[in-house]
Amino acid sequence: MKTPWELLKESKTKIKTTWRIAFVSALVLGLLIHLPVMLSDIPNHDGLGSMYFDQNMITSGRWFLTVACGFSSYFTIPWVIGLIGLIWLALTAAVLTEVLELKDPVTITVVSGLLVSFPALASTFAYVFTMDGYMLALFLAVLAVLFTAKYPRGYLAGAVCLAFSMGIYQAYL
């Protein structure tokens, strides 16, 4: 049995440098950009009724949203939900570098920065009570593209990822 430190050392050699750059730059830039929202709870029209919300939105076709938002809490805790959402977003940036076959660290950082600061995505932070689920949906949608583009029968895994993404939030189709 390996110790956690040995597993960490092994994982460092297995994770591509481009993925690490994308993940870290998206996480750091995301924190810098979205920290004010994560540290305060300024509810919008939906947020007022969602201080505790189990995200059971099956009538809207969001059959997987309850599970996706269940990783954090059904309570609106902006910094927890925001951090989990940023981790999903950073993973999306890493997958995006693979899809776009980016190699240059500056380009990777710029693409990661554009991803976390894009206005349509930044407005999702106003709906902080569902943000972690929505960021998981984005991750699954980009992962579906990666599987479909890179692997011979990747469309099968891509279809599963896309189905779960659509079960969370249909806008990322």
Where do the protein language model's features map onto the residues?
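Transmembrane signal-anchor helices characteristic of membrane glycosylation enzymes that use polyprenol
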Residues: 14-42
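Short, Lys/Arg-rich, polar N-terminal cytosolic tail immediately upstream
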Residues: 1-15
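Membrane-interface alpha helices of multi-pass inner-membrane proteins
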Residues: 155-171
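Aromatic- and kink-enriched transmembrane "portal" helix at the membrane-lumen/periplasm boundary
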Residues: 111-140, 167
